[in-house]
A protein has these predicted regions:
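Hydrophobic membrane-insertion alpha-helices, especially the h-region
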Residues: 1-7
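Long, hydrophobic alpha-helical segments that serve as membrane-spanning/inserting helices
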Residues: 7, 11-228
Protein backbone atom coordinates (compact mmCIF):
# COMPACT_ATOMS: atom_id res chain seq x y z
CA UNK A 1 0.00 0.00 0.00
CA UNK A 2 2.87 2.34 0.85
CA UNK A 3 4.56 1.50 -2.43
CA UNK A 4 1.35 2.07 -4.38
CA UNK A 5 0.83 5.37 -2.59
CA UNK A 6 4.37 6.40 -3.48
CA UNK A 7 3.84 5.44 -7.11
CA UNK A 8 0.55 7.35 -7.25
CA UNK A 9 2.22 10.44 -5.80
CA UNK A 10 5.14 10.09 -8.23
CA UNK A 11 2.72 9.76 -11.15
CA UNK A 12 0.82 12.88 -10.10
CA UNK A 13 4.08 14.83 -9.86
CA UNK A 14 5.15 13.48 -13.24
CA UNK A 15 1.85 14.52 -14.84
CA UNK A 16 2.06 17.97 -13.24
CA UNK A 17 5.58 18.48 -14.62
CA UNK A 18 4.52 17.33 -18.08
CA UNK A 19 1.64 19.81 -18.02
CA UNK A 20 4.09 22.54 -17.02
CA UNK A 21 6.46 21.48 -19.80
CA UNK A 22 3.63 21.60 -22.34
CA UNK A 23 2.62 25.10 -21.21
CA UNK A 24 6.22 26.32 -21.40
CA UNK A 25 6.68 24.89 -24.89
CA UNK A 26 3.48 26.53 -26.14
CA UNK A 27 4.50 29.84 -24.58
CA UNK A 28 8.01 29.57 -26.02
CA UNK A 29 6.61 28.95 -29.50
CA UNK A 30 4.43 32.06 -29.27
CA UNK A 31 7.37 34.16 -28.03
CA UNK A 32 9.48 32.99 -30.95
CA UNK A 33 6.75 33.83 -33.46
CA UNK A 34 6.70 37.36 -32.06
CA UNK A 35 10.50 37.52 -32.41
CA UNK A 36 10.33 36.35 -36.05
CA UNK A 37 7.87 39.14 -36.89
CA UNK A 38 9.86 41.73 -34.93
CA UNK A 39 13.10 40.78 -36.70
CA UNK A 40 11.40 41.07 -40.11
CA UNK A 41 10.34 44.60 -39.21
CA UNK A 42 13.89 45.55 -38.19
CA UNK A 43 15.44 43.93 -41.27
CA UNK A 44 13.14 46.08 -43.40
CA UNK A 45 14.06 49.16 -41.36
CA UNK A 46 17.77 48.48 -41.91
CA UNK A 47 17.18 48.20 -45.67
CA UNK A 48 15.56 51.64 -45.58
CA UNK A 49 18.40 52.99 -43.48
CA UNK A 50 21.02 51.70 -45.93
CA UNK A 51 19.15 53.25 -48.84
CA UNK A 52 18.82 56.64 -47.11
CA UNK A 53 22.44 56.65 -45.96
CA UNK A 54 23.72 55.94 -49.47
CA UNK A 55 21.67 58.82 -50.91
CA UNK A 56 22.87 61.08 -48.11
CA UNK A 57 26.53 60.24 -48.73
CA UNK A 58 26.26 61.04 -52.43
CA UNK A 59 24.48 64.32 -51.70
CA UNK A 60 27.08 65.36 -49.11
CA UNK A 61 29.82 65.01 -51.75
CA UNK A 62 28.06 67.22 -54.29
CA UNK A 63 30.00 70.34 -55.28
CA UNK A 64 26.92 72.57 -55.24
CA UNK A 65 23.70 71.95 -53.32
CA UNK A 66 20.25 73.00 -54.47
CA UNK A 67 17.58 73.90 -51.91
CA UNK A 68 16.13 70.43 -52.45
CA UNK A 69 19.54 68.88 -51.70
CA UNK A 70 19.80 70.84 -48.47
CA UNK A 71 16.32 69.77 -47.40
CA UNK A 72 17.28 66.17 -48.19
CA UNK A 73 20.46 66.41 -46.11
CA UNK A 74 18.37 67.51 -43.13
CA UNK A 75 15.57 64.99 -43.62
CA UNK A 76 17.75 61.97 -44.39
CA UNK A 77 20.11 62.83 -41.54
CA UNK A 78 17.35 63.01 -38.98
CA UNK A 79 15.50 59.97 -40.33
CA UNK A 80 18.77 58.07 -40.21
CA UNK A 81 19.17 58.53 -36.47
CA UNK A 82 15.43 58.10 -35.80
CA UNK A 83 15.31 54.65 -37.42
CA UNK A 84 14.89 51.84 -34.90
CA UNK A 85 16.93 48.79 -35.96
CA UNK A 86 17.17 46.96 -32.64
CA UNK A 87 14.65 44.10 -32.25
CA UNK A 88 12.66 44.05 -29.04
CA UNK A 89 13.15 40.37 -28.23
CA UNK A 90 10.64 38.59 -26.00
CA UNK A 91 12.06 36.80 -22.99
CA UNK A 92 9.01 36.01 -20.83
CA UNK A 93 9.12 32.22 -21.17
CA UNK A 94 12.91 31.95 -20.89
CA UNK A 95 12.84 34.09 -17.75
CA UNK A 96 10.11 31.88 -16.27
CA UNK A 97 12.11 28.75 -17.07
CA UNK A 98 15.21 30.20 -15.43
CA UNK A 99 13.19 31.07 -12.33
CA UNK A 100 11.82 27.52 -12.30
CA UNK A 101 15.32 26.06 -12.14
CA UNK A 102 16.60 26.30 -15.67
CA UNK A 103 15.53 24.03 -18.51
CA UNK A 104 15.12 20.88 -16.38
CA UNK A 105 11.37 20.75 -17.11
CA UNK A 106 12.06 20.28 -20.83
CA UNK A 107 12.83 16.64 -21.54
CA UNK A 108 13.75 17.00 -25.22
CA UNK A 109 17.46 17.83 -25.09
CA UNK A 110 17.53 18.98 -28.71
CA UNK A 111 15.03 21.70 -27.78
CA UNK A 112 17.14 22.64 -24.77
CA UNK A 113 20.22 22.89 -27.00
CA UNK A 114 18.40 25.06 -29.55
CA UNK A 115 17.05 27.39 -26.86
CA UNK A 116 20.56 27.76 -25.42
CA UNK A 117 21.97 28.54 -28.88
CA UNK A 118 19.22 31.09 -29.49
CA UNK A 119 19.86 32.85 -26.18
CA UNK A 120 23.63 32.78 -26.69
CA UNK A 121 23.37 34.38 -30.15
CA UNK A 122 21.03 36.99 -28.69
CA UNK A 123 23.83 37.98 -26.30
CA UNK A 124 26.26 38.20 -29.23
CA UNK A 125 23.82 40.54 -30.96
CA UNK A 126 23.73 42.74 -27.85
CA UNK A 127 27.53 43.02 -27.91
CA UNK A 128 27.30 44.20 -31.53
CA UNK A 129 24.67 46.73 -30.46
CA UNK A 130 27.24 48.37 -28.18
CA UNK A 131 29.57 48.88 -31.15
CA UNK A 132 26.65 50.29 -33.13
CA UNK A 133 25.95 52.78 -30.36
CA UNK A 134 29.50 54.16 -30.51
CA UNK A 135 29.11 54.87 -34.22
CA UNK A 136 25.68 56.40 -33.77
CA UNK A 137 27.22 58.75 -31.21
CA UNK A 138 29.76 59.90 -33.80
CA UNK A 139 26.97 60.60 -36.27
CA UNK A 140 24.99 62.54 -33.67
CA UNK A 141 28.06 64.62 -32.86
CA UNK A 142 28.64 65.34 -36.55
CA UNK A 143 25.01 66.38 -36.97
CA UNK A 144 25.28 68.74 -34.00
CA UNK A 145 28.31 70.38 -35.65
CA UNK A 146 26.66 70.71 -39.06
CA UNK A 147 22.87 71.02 -38.81
CA UNK A 148 20.58 73.66 -37.38
CA UNK A 149 18.67 70.98 -35.48
CA UNK A 150 16.40 73.67 -34.02
CA UNK A 151 14.61 73.60 -37.38
CA UNK A 152 13.28 70.13 -36.60
CA UNK A 153 9.49 70.12 -36.38
CA UNK A 154 7.47 68.37 -33.68
CA UNK A 155 6.78 64.77 -34.82
CA UNK A 156 3.19 63.53 -34.78
CA UNK A 157 4.19 59.88 -35.23
CA UNK A 158 7.27 57.65 -35.20
CA UNK A 159 9.68 58.65 -37.98
CA UNK A 160 7.50 61.64 -38.84
CA UNK A 161 10.43 63.99 -39.47
CA UNK A 162 9.54 67.51 -40.58
CA UNK A 163 11.83 70.46 -41.29
CA UNK A 164 10.65 74.01 -40.68
CA UNK A 165 11.85 75.56 -43.96
CA UNK A 166 10.75 79.06 -42.87
CA UNK A 167 12.91 78.82 -39.75
CA UNK A 168 15.82 77.48 -41.79
CA UNK A 169 15.54 80.45 -44.17
CA UNK A 170 15.49 82.78 -41.18
CA UNK A 171 18.67 81.23 -39.79
CA UNK A 172 20.31 81.44 -43.20
CA UNK A 173 19.53 85.17 -43.36
CA UNK A 174 20.84 85.59 -39.82
CA UNK A 175 24.03 83.48 -40.07
CA UNK A 176 24.72 83.44 -43.81
CA UNK A 177 24.33 79.67 -44.17
CA UNK A 178 21.76 76.92 -43.92
CA UNK A 179 24.34 74.95 -41.97
CA UNK A 180 26.38 75.61 -38.83
CA UNK A 181 29.59 75.30 -40.85
CA UNK A 182 30.72 75.90 -44.42
CA UNK A 183 33.80 73.72 -44.02
CA UNK A 184 33.39 70.95 -46.61
CA UNK A 185 35.74 68.69 -44.66
CA UNK A 186 33.13 68.50 -41.90
CA UNK A 187 30.61 67.20 -44.43
CA UNK A 188 33.09 64.70 -45.87
CA UNK A 189 33.87 63.40 -42.39
CA UNK A 190 30.14 63.13 -41.74
CA UNK A 191 29.73 61.12 -44.96
CA UNK A 192 32.58 58.88 -43.82
CA UNK A 193 30.92 58.26 -40.44
CA UNK A 194 27.68 57.38 -42.22
CA UNK A 195 29.51 54.93 -44.51
CA UNK A 196 31.05 53.21 -41.48
CA UNK A 197 27.69 52.97 -39.75
CA UNK A 198 26.07 51.51 -42.86
CA UNK A 199 28.65 48.75 -42.71
CA UNK A 200 27.90 48.09 -39.05
CA UNK A 201 24.16 48.13 -39.73
CA UNK A 202 24.61 45.66 -42.62
CA UNK A 203 26.55 43.28 -40.38
CA UNK A 204 23.94 43.68 -37.64
CA UNK A 205 21.25 42.87 -40.21
CA UNK A 206 23.02 39.61 -41.05
CA UNK A 207 23.23 38.76 -37.34
CA UNK A 208 19.53 39.26 -36.65
CA UNK A 209 18.64 37.29 -39.80
CA UNK A 210 20.68 34.39 -38.38
CA UNK A 211 18.72 34.71 -35.14
CA UNK A 212 15.49 34.68 -37.11
CA UNK A 213 16.48 31.40 -38.78
CA UNK A 214 17.33 29.95 -35.36
CA UNK A 215 13.87 30.99 -34.17
CA UNK A 216 12.18 29.34 -37.15
CA UNK A 217 14.10 26.10 -36.61
CA UNK A 218 13.17 26.10 -32.94
CA UNK A 219 9.50 26.78 -33.72
CA UNK A 220 9.49 23.76 -36.06
CA UNK A 221 11.08 21.59 -33.36
CA UNK A 222 8.58 22.79 -30.76
CA UNK A 223 5.65 22.08 -33.07
CA UNK A 224 6.92 18.54 -33.64
CA UNK A 225 7.27 17.99 -29.89
CA UNK A 226 3.81 19.40 -29.14
CA UNK A 227 2.26 17.16 -31.80
CA UNK A 228 3.32 14.01 -29.89
Amino acid sequence: AVFLGFMAEYYLEYRAERHKEHDYLVSMKEDLKVDVTEISTRVSAIEGLKEKSLKLEKTLYKTVWTESDIDSIYLWSLKLTATIIKPNFTSNTVDQLKNAGGYRLIKNQEIVRKISEYEKWKETIRVQEEANQLNWRKIHEAQNRILHVTTLGTPKAINDIQIDRTELNRLKALTGSEFLTTDKKEFYQYANDIWVQRGYASYYQIMIKIEQEKAKELIHLLEEELAH
